[in-house]
């Protein structure tokens, strides 16, 4: 088998006193995401998609929130570490398609920077990374601006 697909998901609560970081981009907003690391839900979902594609579990298995080494960790560092795990096993990312669901803030103005970061971390062209922003039409906890959710799918291929 030369190709595999993985799916990833993450959600974090919005709270006062935290920076909002998505796709490695700091987004101006009065609240940020709560988490052990920088709580970048987008990168966590992408990391899970990549790990899942090669049956390596999920982000919590490799970078547990019980480990003080990952307190406040930059999720871009974790994503690059996941890519290295794939490479050790003979796999590389081909493309990623991700969706961020947030009532606020508007994410489209930050999409180009997020795509550039993800592409750089995965070692692929920006035209192989797609990031979409959606609202939840004011429904549920996402619509009440209590959290931000991320979903991602990744295609990987065997190298060599």
Curated annotation (Swiss-Prot):
A divalent metal cation binds at residues 10, 12, 44. Signal peptide: none annotated. It catalyses: 4-CDP-2-C-methyl-D-erythritol 2-phosphate = 2-C-methyl-D-erythritol 2,4-cyclic diphosphate + CMP. The keyword Nucleotide-binding does not apply. SUPFAM superfamilies: IpsF-like. Keywords: Isoprene biosynthesis, Lyase, Metal-binding. Its EC number is 4.6.1.12. Pathway: Isoprenoid biosynthesis; isopentenyl diphosphate biosynthesis via DXP pathway; isopentenyl diphosphate from 1-deoxy-D-xylulose 5-phosphate: step 4/6. GO terms for molecular function: 2-C-methyl-D-erythritol 2,4-cyclodiphosphate synthase activity; metal ion binding. 4-CDP-2-C-methyl-D-erythritol 2-phosphate binds at residues 10-12, 36-37, 58-60, 63-67, 144. It holds the Pfam family YgbB. One of its GO terms (biological process) is terpenoid biosynthetic process. Binds 1 divalent metal cation per subunit. Belongs to the IspF family. PANTHER family: 2-C-METHYL-D-ERYTHRITOL 2,4-CYCLODIPHOSPHATE SYNTHASE, CHLOROPLASTIC. Involved in the biosynthesis of isopentenyl diphosphate (IPP) and dimethylallyl diphosphate (DMAPP), two major building blocks of isoprenoid compounds. Catalyzes the conversion of 4-diphosphocytidyl-2-C-methyl-D-erythritol 2-phosphate (CDP-ME2P) to 2-C-methyl-D-erythritol 2,4-cyclodiphosphate (ME-CPP) with a corresponding release of cytidine 5-monophosphate (CMP). This is 2-C-methyl-D-erythritol 2,4-cyclodiphosphate synthase.
């Amino acid at each position: 088998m030369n190709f595999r697909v993985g799916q990833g998901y993450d959600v974090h609560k919005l709270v006062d006193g935290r920076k909002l970081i998505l796709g490695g981009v700091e987004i101006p907003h009065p609240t940020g995401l709560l988490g052990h690391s920088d709580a970048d839900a987008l990168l966590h979902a992408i990391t899970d998609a990549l790990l899942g594609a090669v049956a390596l579990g999920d982000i919590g298995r490799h970078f547990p929130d019980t480990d003080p080494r990952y307190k406040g960790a930059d999720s871009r560092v974790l994503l690059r570490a996941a890519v290295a795990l794939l490479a050790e096993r003979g796999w590389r990312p081909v493309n990623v398609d991700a969706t961020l669901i947030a009532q606020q803030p508007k994410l489209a103005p930050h999409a180009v920077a997020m795509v550039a970061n993800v592409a750089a971390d995965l070692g692929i062209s920006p035209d192989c990374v797609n990031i979409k922003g959606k609202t939840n039409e004011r429904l549920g906890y996402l619509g009440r601006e209590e959290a931000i959710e991320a979903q991602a799918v990744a295609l990987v291929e065997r190298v060599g």
